[in-house]
Amino acid sequence: MSEKVVLAYSGGLDTSAAVKWLQEKYGMDVIAVTIDVGNEKDFTLIKEKALKVGAKKAYVRDVRKEFAEDYIWKAIKANSMYEGVYPLATALARPLIAKVMVDIALEEGATAIAHGCTGKGNDQVRFDVGINTLAPHLKIIAPARQWGMTREQTMEYAQKWGIPVPISVKNPFSIDENLWGRSIECGLLEDPWNEPIPEVFAWTRPVEETPDEPEYLEVEFEQGVPVAVNGEKLSPLALIQKVHDIASLHGVGRIDHVENRLVGIKSREIYEAPAAVVLIAAHQALEAMTLSKSQLRFKQMVEATYSDIIYNGLWFSALRQDLDAFIDSSQRFVSGTVRLKLSKGSFRVVGRKSPYSLYHKGMATYDKGDQFDPSSAVGFITLWGLQAKLQAQLQPILEEEKGNKS
């Protein structure tokens, strides 16, 4: 009896070619697993394709709800933006995919898990580390990392075996998408001087095709988690879709970024993340009103580490769980509503309110009703500037003494 290998199957070029390659190279029975994390695909056709290209069995698992509640919501509370730009859509889905792959491998009695990651990308690290953490006894096979074929050669290999190839050699974009965003790379995008052609974008409208009138969007949060849009309570999936639809209509969410990959190289990446950029910005605005200065400053350091953890494939680490404990505690009073204005490819926060706001109008106003006691400022300024004053007075003397001795 042949050994079983569970393959993370997307229906794309690399994983379709991998089915045949695993059979040729290892003589293993391939079990294809396709995981729905919000991909806009026909999963029935993908399952049929997996069986057609040689898989012994094919699974489709819908984990969108789990992805939103257990991954995306955590990312929002942590304001997760890698290098301050990328909302980590692809990176955030990888640990969940690894978890489902391990679960099915254990159910099937498989001895190995395979994925279609290349040797240059970050995903190979995310999958390998996740799988090794959850099930270290399982062997990991990465065909695209081993076979040494270029993308064009992989296309030729697939065509040799009659595997449909849905992309062209002339413009071979590699695309990944889920609830939280869409990433596009390869082809002409590998030259960072090239402007992305219109065909790169599938979610967001070009600015010239967006409405002339701006649109207002209100997002309500409860303890750091978005729960309603424009006054309507929504499920996690419906809420993300609602914000996505409004933001993409106005051309919001396009990102063109040269980022530092985990493997040590720089990569030009194009992203579409309309819901992500809007919801994270709204959350940050609410935190600015409900967290103290010291909380915000410390949390910003935590957020940078948290984003790196996601990007670097360490979701299942103890440190991520430890940071979650702090982040969850910080969100106790992050409840309220944020109003945003979207227009012509951009947006900005134009209002916020919270029953737990630390903004005190009576203390901040310069108009009638001012409750701030200006006489308090004199003593504060004296103490606040004492360190600088003493240093200015004492160190020039010390420097003169040093000069006299030399």
Swiss-Prot record:
Keywords: Amino-acid biosynthesis, Arginine biosynthesis, ATP-binding, Cytoplasm, Ligase, Nucleotide-binding. GO terms for biological process: argininosuccinate metabolic process; L-arginine biosynthetic process; urea cycle. Pathway: Amino-acid biosynthesis; L-arginine biosynthesis; L-arginine from L-ornithine and carbamoyl phosphate: step 2/3. Its EC number is 6.3.4.5. L-citrulline binds at Y86, N122, R126, S174, S183, E259, Y271. ATP binds at A8, Y9, S10, G11, G12, L13, D14, T15, S16, G116. This is Argininosuccinate synthase. It comes from Dehalococcoides mccartyi (strain ATCC BAA-2100 / JCM 16839 / KCTC 5957 / BAV1). The lineage of its organism: Bacteria, Bacillati, Chloroflexota, Dehalococcoidia, Dehalococcoidales.
